[in-house]
């Protein structure tokens, strides 16, 4: 995991290969571990997208929603976070629409009763094998379009 600024720092090594597509899922660490506002976080995300578009204009960009967390796994760390993630995902969807990018709603496929089910996570946030299977099924059809 990383924050958006860390993802930006890694872009040069990724974009030098001029990838056909990039699948971005970013912002969970920023939301969970910093006091950053949605507005500031989205500005960082937009910067990430601008760099990709500028440095690798033929790269197709897919924006993935954030995944839910399992709040009951660690109430202190994750309590109330799914509401924030839902709000952020809505803002990501809007941003993708404004920019003409594909938004992939992984949240809906991954969640049960509004959170990440225990069997799909190893620690409340990171996926287990069962979680990765759900994720792969959600993005497979987009991968084959590339």
Segments (PLM) and residue ranges:
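Conserved SGNH/GDSL esterase-like catalytic core that processes O-acyl groups on lipids
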Residues: 1-47, 83-86
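Catalytic His-Asp segment of secreted/periplasmic serine-dependent ester chemistry enzymes
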Residues: 68-146
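Sec-exported extracytoplasmic/periplasmic mature domains
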Residues: 12, 16, 27, 50-57, ...
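Loop/turn elements at helix/coil->beta-strand transitions in domains of secreted/extracellular proteins
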Residues: 18-21, 56-60, 99-102
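Hydrophobic, well-ordered secondary-structure scaffolds
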Residues: 45, 49-53, 135
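Active-site segments of SGNH/GDSL-like serine hydrolases
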Residues: 25-31, 50-87
């Amino acid at each position: 995991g990383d924050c958006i600024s860390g993802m930006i720092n890694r872009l040069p090594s990724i974009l030098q290969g001029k990838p056909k597509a990039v699948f971005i899922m970013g912002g969970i660490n920023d939301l969970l571990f910093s006091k950053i506002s949605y507005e500031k976080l989205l500005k960082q995300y937009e910067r990430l997208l601008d760099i990709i578009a500028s440095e690798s204009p033929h790269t197709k960009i897919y924006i993935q929603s954030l995944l839910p967390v399992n709040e009951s796994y660690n109430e202190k760390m994750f309590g109330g976070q799914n509401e924030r993630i839902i709000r952020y995902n809505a803002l990501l969807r809007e941003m993708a629409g404004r920019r003409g990018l594909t938004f992939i709603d992984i949240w809906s496929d991954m969640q049960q009763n509004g959170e990440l089910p225990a069997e799909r996570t190893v620690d409340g946030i990171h996926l287990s094998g069962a979680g990765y299977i759900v994720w792969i099924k959600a993005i497979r059809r987009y991968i084959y379009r590339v």
